Amino acid sequence: MKLKFIILLIVVLVGVPVPARGQIVTDSKSSKQIADSIRAELDSRPYFSLYKDTYFVGGTVLGGTPDKYNSDVKFQISFQQRLTKSNLPWNSYLYLFYTQKAIWNVLENSLPFHDLNFNPGVGLSKYIIMKDKLVGKATVMIEHESNGRAGTASRSWNKVSLAGEAYISPSLMAHAKYWIPIVDGKYNRDILRYSGLYQAGFQAMSLDDKWVLDMTLVKRKGWDLNFNTIVQLGYRINHNSNQFIMLQYYNGYGESLLDFKQYHSRIRFGLLIRPRFFSDF
């Protein structure tokens, strides 16, 4: 299964047509002009924008008795800053990104934050245009993730990641991401057994653009079918808004860095703010 996933990822990442090598290329100038106009339209979008989903949700354990120790608020903010237009080699562009996730114990005395996870990085992306259509995006990125804690609560690792997105239709996107880990945290040497080596999933919008459904499976280290599962279902508040009422389900390990070895099955409800286009994962 791992081999099939890697083959699929490679196809997505390198599936850019190479002219004049066993292909019949017709009206190449016109096709190039169309591709340039697509990139120009994408480059005209704001340099600063949302990256991954931003959300604020609260909930409790699924399949157990809720109490103040297993009920919490979880929120995430995520944004990116594009540094260039897509005029670097291979029509790629450079960008910075930052994601911060928090687990907040709002039912305990003094409302303490249980864990804060910081995920900055830099990426190089290329839009994939085939047959005069935008069909995907390929990205290589360097990212860091840590929780800013000291002593035995400290968690930290780095990743060189390869990611691909395939835009199957205007309302359906499949995504995959594989990372080469560099684990530098003293107290999370075995993090791959819980937080995984690669992930795959999809994002789908209803035809009326009111509903959005995400599903991501994160494969943990090992040959067993051991996945962390994240499912999100959102309903758009109004037609012209990027705000949704969301139900989020998490099942598995690695939901936060501090508790990466702990199994969680949580259901949460709240507000989702997502990009106008498909989200990044």
State what each model feature region is.
Residues 24-25, 146, 182-184, 214-216, ...:
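Intrinsically disordered, low-complexity linker/tail regions enriched in polar/charged residues
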Residues 1-39, 279-281:
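Cleavable N-terminal export/targeting peptides
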